[in-house]
Amino acid sequence: MGDHLDLLLGVVLMAGPVFGIPSCSFDGRIAFYRFCNLTQVPQVLNTTERLLLSFNYIRTVTASSFPFLEQLQLLELGSQYTPLTIDKEAFRNLPNLRILDLGSSKIYFLHPDAFQGLFHLFELRLYFCGLSDAVLKDGYFRNLKALTRLDLSKNQIRSLYLHPSFGKLNSLKSIDFSSNQIFLVCEHELEPLQGKTLSFFSLAANSLYSRVSVDWGKCMNPFRNMVLEILDVSGNGWTVDITGNFSNAISKSQAFSLILAHHIMGAGFGFHNIKDPDQNTFAGLARSSVRHLDLSHGFVFSLNSRVFETLKDLKVLNLAYNKINKIADEAFYGLDNLQVLNLSYNLLGELYSSNFYGLPKVAYIDLQKNHIAIIQDQTFKFLEKLQTLDLRDNALTTIHFIPSIPDIFLSGNKLVTLPKINLTANLIHLSENRLENLDILYFLLRVPHLQILILNQNRFSSCSGDQTPSENPSLEQLFLGENMLQLAWETELCWDVFEGLSHLQVLYLNHNYLNSLPPGVFSHLTALRGLSLNSNRLTVLSHNDLPANLEILDISRNQLLAPNPDVFVSLSVLDITHNKFICECELSTFINWLNHTNVTIAGPPADIYCVYPDSFSGVSLFSLSTEGCDEEEVLKSLKFSLFIVCTVTLTLFLMTILTVTKFRGFCFICYKTAQRLVFKDHPQGTEPDMYKYDAYLCFSSKDFTWVQNALLKHLDTQYSDQNRFNLCFEERDFVPGENRIANIQDAIWNSRKIVCLVSRHFLRDGWCLEAFSYAQGRCLSDLNSALIMVVVGSLSQYQLMKHQSIRGFVQKQQYLRWPEDLQDVGWFLHKLSQQILKKEKEKKKDNNIPLQTVATIS
């Protein structure tokens, strides 16, 4: 019942903001008058159930201060800014009051009969009120038959001489005397409480027994004939001797839970002049039925042998926040019923196989926040009842010592890899380690009966690719957040890591730098209900990326620009806050869906905002209108069509260029054929003029066969009627018996053009070079470009420049080069024909003005 009232009070303390009740007002049941500068109790309705008057300036409370409030259950008068005077029967008009809170108010005067008439008062709070011993000695609490909780902490009480009326408070279960100045408590002081069973009794932070000399023979047992469920004597600065004497003094009293936290027992680290608890320290508690012993927040350095030997009923032992560095052999001997052992926040560096002997029923061992780096193999193997082992935040580099137990906590260590051991567990917590290879994940997913696997804040970024997934029918929750899975998956390996997890219900992949999701990576997760992908770099999410039965998706803090709403229609809850939405018409479909969907959108609307364009930056998507985007869609279609037309045209153009370039010879032949067919361009001779030949072909006799096949058969009329040129060349047209130079000169001057076929043989033939020189001479004489030079073969510029006669021509005139690709021969012959047919400009005629002799006058 008391727990329910505590919960009720907590609700009341938040009544203003929760129920929307404005300050200094009431709604018929709750009167909310905190911080209202009141100097007296306000008048409220008789239906009021809770009256909150804290943080005001009320000075006096008398019997007439309150109207008759039969339904009032909670009165809060604490934390007044002025000293408070409470007169006789000040609360008699509140007959059904259950909780009276006067805490943190400086009580200037409290009448001994102030609380008379509160027959139903359940809890009385008088903490930090400046009260003295008189409140206990003078019967202030008599007749409070329903009183269960009495809080007198943080006052100025120095002794616990209780008024005999305490013996009649049969409902009293909890008394708090903590943070007073009670230096000594003896048997006769608490005599009115003898025979009672108290759920809580606190003497914490009083410097009890530590500032005075105690004659334990006279003081005797302060809790004689009492049963205490929780006895709190923490924070009193007890040494080993004081603790031992106190244990002996209360040896015949029942104290199920003994809190001795914040003590000064133990040598600490580096000191030897203060004793650690030994075999005699807790010997007096042998018959006290202690089940829970709290020795946390002290300086114990060494757990000595059999230090807890007499505590046969102990089930929970809390040794956290000490300086324990050494556990002696048989330190836990005698703790046959211990179930929970807390050794967290100590200085343990290594554990040995003998450390936990004597704990046959221990189910939970907490060793977190030590410095453990080495653990012997058999340390936990013999603990047959062990259910949970907590080794978080140590310095472990291997786990070969881990037994098969349901819950294993190993986060915050230095694990880089895991040994291949036979392991069975329900929960494995391995976050904040240094695991890198996904082979470790494959191994852990094979652990039988595993239900929860936590691997957050590791370094998973590589994959060997030689692992195969195996069926795990038990795993329900997998935490892989804050790793680097993008680096592993971008190698196209380990995409099958989730294949065997047909019963997985919750998967966390947040903070993994994911740019995209591997195809089908979730396709086998048929039972998945919740998926977290928040704080990644996803820009696109397609329907095939998500499991079919997914209900809850967290994809917040990604880089989604314009998501497709069809991806989310099957969800129940969606968190899409803090993405980088581009608020243009492409987003209109998603905005419309967002405003009309039945899917629960997590997070405040202000967190779903635009980042572009700048005019909409920071604007919530729920505030945007999509009007005008229909015309934009039409324009978009038009733009797309225009894009397609331009793309096709450009593609055809490029393909045409590529085809013509690749098959240019064939294309040229087709062009010439079409020209003849369309324009009836039949071969015909050249126009008659003053020249006997159209061209003189000058070449080396060693090249005759090639010249005949390559040129003469395609150009010379005597080789074919289809040809149009009357050519001159040495082998046919030179007059036998005549001087060779004369033949050359005659051929040069009787031909419209001179075509020199310069090959390697040409450069070695003196007559050819001589003919080239004569041809240059004609060009100089006629001031025209009758000489056509054709380079045949792979002759370099340097080879041509070595010959003086050719050097001058190459430096000043253009020349042709016989094509290397056979398909270019037709085009080349056409170009050569055009050069032969090309007429030179007529030379200007002289005016033929005769010169006359000019007479000189002397």
Curated annotation (Swiss-Prot):
Pfam family, one: LRR_8
Subcellular location: Cell membrane
Cited Gene3D superfamilies: Ribonuclease Inhibitor (3.80.10.10), Toll/interleukin-1 receptor homology (TIR) domain (3.40.50.10140)
Alphabetical UniProt keywords: Cell membrane, Disulfide bond, Glycoprotein, Immunity, Inflammatory response, Innate immunity, Leucine-rich repeat, Membrane, Phosphoprotein, Receptor, Repeat, Signal, Systemic lupus erythematosus, Transmembrane, Transmembrane helix
Transmembrane portions of the chain: 640-660
Tissues of expression: Highly expressed on the basolateral surface of intestinal epithelia. Expressed also in other cells such as lung epithelial cells.
TIR domain span: 691-836
Positions of disulphide bridges: C583-C610, C585-C629
Residues with PTM Phosphoserine: S805
Post-translational modification comment from the UniProt entry: Phosphorylated at Ser-805 by PKD/PRKD1; phosphorylation induces the production of inflammatory cytokines. Phosphorylated at Tyr-798 upon flagellin binding; required for signaling.
Residues listed as glycosylation sites in the UniProt record: N37, N46, N245, N342, N422, N595, N598
GO MF annotation list: interleukin-1 receptor binding; pattern recognition receptor activity; signaling receptor activity; transmembrane signaling receptor activity
Cytoplasmic topology ranges: 661-858
Record domain LRRCT: where: 579-631
Superkingdom classification of source: Eukaryota
GO cellular component: plasma membrane
Extracellular compartment spans: 21-639
Keyword Transmembrane: yes
Segments annotated as LRR repeats: 45-68, 71-93, 95-117, 120-143, 146-166, 171-192, 197-211, 214-229, 234-235, 260-284, 289-301, 313-334, 337-355, 385-401, 412-431, 449-470, 474-495, 503-524, 527-546, 549-567
Phosphotyrosine found at: Y798
Annotated signal peptide: 1-20
Subunit annotation: Homodimer. Interacts with MYD88 (via TIR domain). Interacts with TICAM1 (via TIR domain). Interacts with UNC93B1; this interaction is essential for proper TLR5 localization to the plasma membrane.
Function: Pattern recognition receptor (PRR) located on the cell surface that participates in the activation of innate immunity and inflammatory response. Recognizes small molecular motifs named pathogen-associated molecular pattern (PAMPs) expressed by pathogens and microbe-associated molecular patterns (MAMPs) usually expressed by resident microbiota. Upon ligand binding such as bacterial flagellins, recruits intracellular adapter proteins MYD88 and TRIF leading to NF-kappa-B activation, cytokine secretion and induction of the inflammatory response.
Family note: Belongs to the Toll-like receptor family.
Name of protein: Toll-like receptor 5
Organism of this sequence: Homo sapiens (Human)
